[in-house]
Amino acid sequence: MTGVYERRVASIRASEFQSMMHHPSQDSPTLPESTATDSGYYSPGAAAGHPHHGYCSPTSATYGKALNAYQYQYHGMNGAAANYSGKAYSDYGYGSPYHPHHQYSGAYNRVQPPSTQPEKEVSEPEVRMVNGKPKKIRKPRTIYSSFQLAALQRRFQKTQYLALPERAELAASLGLTQTQVKIWFQNKRSKIKKIMKNGELPPEHSPSSSDPMACNSPQSPVVWEPQGSSRSLSHHPHVHSHPQPSSSSPASSYLENSGVWYPTGTHLQNLQNHASLQHPLALASGTLY
């Protein structure tokens, strides 16, 4: 009996190196360490009642400190060491009778660990089905107030392209975003190009759109001229053709003024005769005094 035991011990030592080559250490994060109960269960004394099955020797007790505590070797009656892996049993849903801890390892290996990196959430625009076809939902159009439209129109007449500081300043003054101002200018430029391509006059060049106080009525004459003056010049050109007398008498000044308002020839002749009569009377009165 002692010789048989020594022969088996020698075979165990020889098979340790083989088990290290074929069975690397497997650490199970969910199972506890081997206890004295496990060693007692797999001790040669516990297996003595079933000699036809052989016995299992723990490799972590005396000989196999380098091996894992959960690895065991099965030795048959002929002393040859046979390595049994619990994976063959775990694939069928039950554990090995000699390796009960492998019933957990098979299920643990089949469970995929959760991914450590969170998936990036890609925000896609809402899509709805229209007549069986997917269609993206457009954003609502921006409604501009009359004050905002007037300010944008005035700025567009000055320049059709805005720099970044100008666009930011205009958007802040009107309470809009820079994107809204940029889109408004883009739409306005495309509209102007389309109108000019069709050969139509842009509304910006009309006086009513550029200046709200402008009037399209014809201009009134600047200088008001009496109708009698034009008539007197056309019918009586001889009034201005004759040289005026050099004397600044009241009669001569009266004749000049009356020529415009009284164009009739009879009245003009009477005035001239009256002036000629007053001139010799003035000379005679001077001699008397």
UniProtKB/Swiss-Prot annotation:
Write out the tissue specificity statement of the associated record.
Expression restricted to anterior ectodermal derivatives, namely the ventral forebrain, the cranial neural crest and the cement gland. Also expressed in the olfactory and otic placodes.
Keywords from UniProt, A to Z, are: Developmental protein, DNA-binding, Homeobox, Nucleus
Give yes or no: UniProt keyword Nucleus: yes
Record-level Gene Ontology MF annotations: DNA-binding transcription factor activity, RNA polymerase II-specific; RNA polymerase II cis-regulatory region sequence-specific DNA binding
Q: Where do the TM regions start and end?
A: none
Q: What segments bear the compositional bias annotation Polar residues?
A: 26-40, 206-220
Concerning Gene3D superfamilies, the annotation shows: Homeodomain-like
What residues are annotated to bind DNA?
A: 137-196
For this protein, the record's SUPFAM superfamilies field holds:
Homeodomain-like (SSF46689)
Q: Could you name the Gene Ontology cellular component terms for this entry? A: nucleus
Q: Where in the cell is it found?
A: Nucleus
* Protein's GO biological process: anatomical structure formation involved in morphogenesis; cell differentiation; embryonic skeletal system development; regulation of transcription by RNA polymerase II
Q: Which regions are flagged for Low complexity bias?
A: 242-253
Q: Which Pfam families match?
A: DLL_N, Homeodomain
Region Disordered: list its residue ranges: 16-44, 198-254
Q: Which family does it belong to?
A: Belongs to the distal-less homeobox family.
Please give the name of this protein.
Homeobox protein DLL-3
Say which species the protein is native to: Xenopus laevis (African clawed frog)
* Protein's gene: dll3
